[in-house]
């Protein structure tokens, strides 16, 4: 048989030259390990199948090279050994010493019926053997009769019918079991293949970009050390960008008078994981304050709108009710200050999938509603204070109380 083995590790030739010696155990002999991998052999599945088939045929006494066992042969001898006694052993309804000669007609022999040691060379159907008859399902005197025997159907045809039915039923059940076994094996192999491919994709995907960059660099320069130097420079630049982002967040939080003393500020020598953790903490603290401010502005703007619409002078149709919501925004401010965390969570869940432009509109929208009310309140307070000062009450205590009441009224 042709040798179809091949080296499984042939595609790994020269892999040790791509490895970074700083990340490998010093006691490991890379050249020896590469030789062991390169020397490993693997055979094709068809060779394994042929070995199992030949071993099974040998255990059953079958020789595939013998022409007497060929299905296409007209003279197929099953067994020529007669028993030492008068009664011959019958296996599967067919005698071992029966000989298939030229006188057996075509309708008396078919493939796949004789199960003497799994030899499938012929079958006896409901038809008759013309050069001799089988009596009572067995051959008498342990021999095949000569051409002088009476030609015609066998006497015990019912037994042969039962035997033929049992053989056909057995063949049918065997074919069904074999088909179900193949289906189960194919499903199991397909499931294992998908599991292995999914595992290989998960394990290889994170390092694919780095391997591609290394291969491209080796094709252009051919020096692995220069590649690792570039990787180190790239990591250093990434750290510098992230440290600058940390400084911007610290400056913004400092302007908002938000404490950051509990956060350890990383340096250029810190690991990338530490820098990312600090950025995440500062970002959460920043957006938490911003999101709570957005919620407060929106709700206070709604309260201002209710104050303008329902100031005690307008009546609700069909209810004959005149609500007065003057000063509602002050109550909202006190309540929302106690729920800054909840309001930041609500707004954060709403804006996490929004675009930057939408976030800007959400940030500036409440200010458009609040600005006219703030300007109107400021102008009114200035006018009232000016009129009070121009009036000039004689009692200073009375003037102080009037100014205080005016400011308190305008701040509502």
UniProtKB/Swiss-Prot annotation:
Sequence repeats by residue range: 112-116, 117-121, 122-126, 127-131, 132-136, 137-141, 142-146
UniProt region (7 X 5 AA tandem repeats of G-[NS]-[IV]-R-[DNS]), positions on chain: 112-146
Keywords tagged on the record: Late protein, Repeat
Coiled coil spans: none
Region span, Disordered: 116-208
Compositional bias per record (Basic and acidic residues), positions renumbered to this chain: 192-208
Biased composition (Low complexity): 116-126
TM region positions: none
Transmembrane helix is among the record's keywords: no
Induction description: Expressed in the late phase of the viral replicative cycle.
Keyword Repeat listed: yes
Record family assignment: Belongs to the asfivirus B407L family.
UniProt name for this protein: Uncharacterized protein B407L
């Amino acid at each position: 048989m042709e040798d179809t083995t091949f080296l499984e590790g042939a595609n790994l030739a020269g892999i040790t030259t791509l490895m970074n010696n700083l990340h490998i155990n010093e006691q490991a002999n890379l050249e020896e390990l590469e030789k062991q991998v390169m020397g490993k052999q693997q055979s094709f599945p068809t060779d394994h199948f042929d070995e199992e088939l030949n071993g099974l045929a040998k255990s059953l006494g079958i020789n595939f090279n013998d022409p007497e066992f060929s299905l296409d042969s007209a003279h197929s001898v099953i067994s020529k050994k007669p028993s030492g006694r008068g009664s011959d052993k019958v296996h599967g309804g067919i005698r071992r010493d029966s000989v298939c000669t030229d006188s057996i007609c075509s309708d008396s022999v078919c493939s796949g019926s004789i199960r003497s040691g799994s030899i499938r060379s012929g079958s006896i159907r409901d038809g008759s053997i013309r050069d001799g008859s089988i009596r009572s399902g067995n051959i008498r005197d342990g021999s095949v009769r000569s051409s002088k025997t009476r030609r015609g159907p066998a006497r015990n045809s019912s037994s042969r019918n039962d035997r033929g039915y049992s053989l056909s039923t057995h063949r049918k059940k065997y074919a069904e079991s074999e088909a179900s076994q193949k289906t189960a094996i194919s499903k199991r192999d397909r499931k294992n293949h998908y599991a292995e491919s999914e595992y290989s994709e998960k394990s290889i995907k994170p390092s694919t970009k780095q391997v591609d960059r290394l291969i491209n660099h080796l094709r252009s320069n051919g020096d692995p050390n220069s590649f690792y130097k570039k990787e180190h420079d790239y990591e250093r630049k990434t750290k510098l960008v992230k440290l600058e982002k940390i400084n911007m967040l610290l400056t913004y939080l400092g302007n908002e008078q938000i404490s950051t003393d509990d956060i350890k500020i990383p340096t250029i020598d810190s690991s990338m994981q530490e820098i990312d953790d600090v950025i995440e903490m500062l970002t959460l603290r920043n957006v938490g304050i911003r999101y709570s401010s957005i919620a407060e502005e929106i709700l206070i703007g709604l309260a201002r709108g209710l104050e303008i619409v329902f100031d005690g002078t307008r009546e609700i149709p069909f209810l004959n009710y005149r609500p007065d919501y003057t000063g509602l925004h002050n109550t909202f401010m006190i309540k929302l200050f106690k729920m800054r965390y909840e309001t930041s969570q609500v707004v954060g869940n709403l804006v996490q999938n929004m675009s930057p432009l939408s976030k800007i509109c959400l940030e500036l929208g409440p200010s458009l509603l609040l600005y006219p009310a703030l300007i109107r309140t400021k102008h009114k307070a200035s006018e009232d204070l000016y009129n009070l000062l121009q009036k000039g009450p004689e009692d200073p205590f009375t003037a102080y109380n009037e100014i205080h009441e005016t400011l308190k009224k305008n701040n509502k």
